Amino acid sequence: MGSTGSVSAWDEALLIAAIQYPVPIIRGPEDIQVQVQQICKTMDSTKAGYPDLDFIVFPEYSAQGLNTKIWTYDEMLLSLDSPEIDCFRRACIRNDVWGVFSIMERNEDPSQIPYNTAIIINSNGEIVLHYRKLQPWVPIEPWMPGNLGMPVCEGPKGAKLAVCICHDGMFPELAREAAYKGCNVFIRISGYSTQVNDQWIWTNRTNAWQNLMYTVSVNLAGYDEVFYYFGEGTICNYDGNIIQQGQRNPWEIVTAELFPRLADKARENWALENSIFNLGCRGYVGKPGGERANYLTWVRDLANGEYKLPWDENIRIRDGWKYYPEGVKLGPLPKIDE
């Protein structure tokens, strides 16, 4: 159960707003500051329009954009203690709202590739979840694969929150990992271009249905002089049905009223639909208690570091390909000759 969301919500309802943020055009670090200020102003205006709002979600790359020529250089990156993050913290406190934000995060080892990161900040201005993208969109994205797993945190109104970033959501294993750890509201922030528009909608729905959890997904919108980004924020019920879906408009605010307790009750009381439970105790009618032994070859091989496809040797693209023929560039921004 859920509703499309409005300006008010009752006590058990989690009122959430997903912002189809216009894709930023970033030519240097000064442009990042402009976007950070605009994100914070957007929080102020959205809360003013939706006074009962609990949670606001911004897409991947909303602060730092997708300028692939410079996006890995030092000046283009942020850390959790950067002043820009303090701006997000203050905006959450000022508006008494939780927020999800995207940053391209410096690696602790400056000789190593940066991370693509999402953070959740609570209404007290505290970072309560820190996630690094597990599945960068190769070969376009150069980011270091995440090393923090799939964390889950307590949220408002009974929500148990997890975040994935863009292409992560194409892997059913990652949504299942979040659900297995208790998540009942799974957030997906994205900077996808139109190549995978339909697949975006399918996976938002299947991630919800297969795990009996709400999914809240939002993408950048607009054109950045290279790609067009499709917006289409999608909020799905725990039965996989769409509660609310945006169009392709930049600045569209996709809202919904969620009831996390109902997702929990579905997990506890549904039978035929309870795939996440049935996965681990197969055929509990024919075999009391169900069969619990691992029966999946790929699970065993992945756990042993031996994951290999039958066609592995024929896979053509497995490095930086035409996007990074000379490798990923690190260090300070190159000086432009006068």
From Swiss-Prot:
Catalytic activities: formamide + H2O = formate + NH4(+)
GO biological process terms on file: putrescine biosynthetic process from arginine
Stretches assigned to the CN hydrolase domain: 14-260
Positions of disulphide bridges: none
Record: active site: 60 (proton acceptor), 133 (proton donor), 166 (nucleophile)
Pfam families named in the record: CN_hydrolase (PF00795)
Cross-referenced PROSITE patterns: CN_HYDROLASE
InterPro entries in the cross-refs: Aliph_Amidase/BUP (IPR050345), C-N_Hydrolase (IPR003010), C-N_Hydrolase_sf (IPR036526), Formamidase (IPR022843)
Key words of the record: Hydrolase
Enzyme class: hydrolase
EC number annotated for this UniProt entry: 3.5.1.49
Gene3D superfamilies: Carbon-nitrogen hydrolase
GO molecular function, a single term: formamidase activity
Superkingdom as given in the UniProt entry: Bacteria
Family classification: Belongs to the carbon-nitrogen hydrolase superfamily. Aliphatic amidase family.
Function, in words: Is an aliphatic amidase with a restricted substrate specificity, as it only hydrolyzes formamide.
Protein name: Formamidase
